[in-house]
Amino acid sequence: MDITNIKEMNYEEVFSITITVDKPILIGQDDIVGRRQLIPIISGKVSGNNFNGKVLPGGIDSQIVRPDGKCELSARYAIRLDDGAAIYIENNGIRTVPDEYIEAVKSGEFVDPNAYYFRTIPTFETYSPKYKWMMNHIFVCCASRLPENVLLKFYKIS
């Protein structure tokens, strides 16, 4: 047996979510820690191959934007699919921005998504037997902050 012959990872896009958010709620800010903010998740659309639905209201994205522009985020929200199944999503990650874009991002200006790194690691909770498989796989998410919403693309790692 060759224990060095480990199966390589592959990934496949399973679905995407376009999320509509409200204005950030500022919790606090200083020059050492950064800016803590809560961003309400209002709604959104789920799209995929036989995986479509909507984002339920009531979610929140808790962020801390460090003085160097790095954003540490932790979002909690739920989706309801067209077949009636509900899935709770916990999505933790980071967004790092090159120095030349830090001030634009801090002020809320639009920055080309290809100019920065925005990745998350989502986990899922569901009571639907049809989607329990999601709880047993690792996913990664590529994200983009667009002028009107946030685009998340979810990839299953195999």
From Swiss-Prot:
Coiled-coil segments: none
Gene3D superfamilies reported in the protein's UniProt record: 2.40.160.20
NCBIfam families: PRK00872.1-4
Protein's recorded name: UPF0311 protein CA_C3321
Xref: InterPro entries: UPF0311
Protein species of origin: Clostridium acetobutylicum (strain ATCC 824 / DSM 792 / JCM 1419 / IAM 19013 / LMG 5710 / NBRC 13948 / NRRL B-527 / VKM B-1787 / 2291 / W)
PANTHER family: UPF0311 PROTEIN BLR7842
Assigned protein family: Belongs to the UPF0311 family.
